[in-house]
Amino acid sequence: MKKNNIIYWTTTGLFSAMMLFSASMYFTSPEVQANFTKMGFQDAFRIELGIAKIIGALVLLIPFLKGSVKEWAYAGFGITLISASILHASVGDPIANSITPLIFLGILVVSHIFWKKLLKATV
């Protein structure tokens, strides 16, 4: 149980920190803003995605939130990360830009697996 707890909080904390950092860059970095424009997105999408990442990261971090709220956060992040990987590949970005979201998807999957294990242990 303790090992599962450590793995869950380590992966969830790392993932959430990266999503919060990413969201902050959406609001503060002219380079990130230019990249969204280059990929054909309107500015409102960048802001919406930044807000969604902040909310999702907080949902993952708040311990007393259980059930479908966390499931939706996990699903939303999964879709976002897969989409980011495909998008970076389709616009000809360096391969690292396509692989990075998949690495974080792996961290997200580990977090989800251990969240489920912790839920089963408390039932």
Regions found by a protein language model. Name each.
Residues 1-123:
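Membrane-interface extramembranous regions
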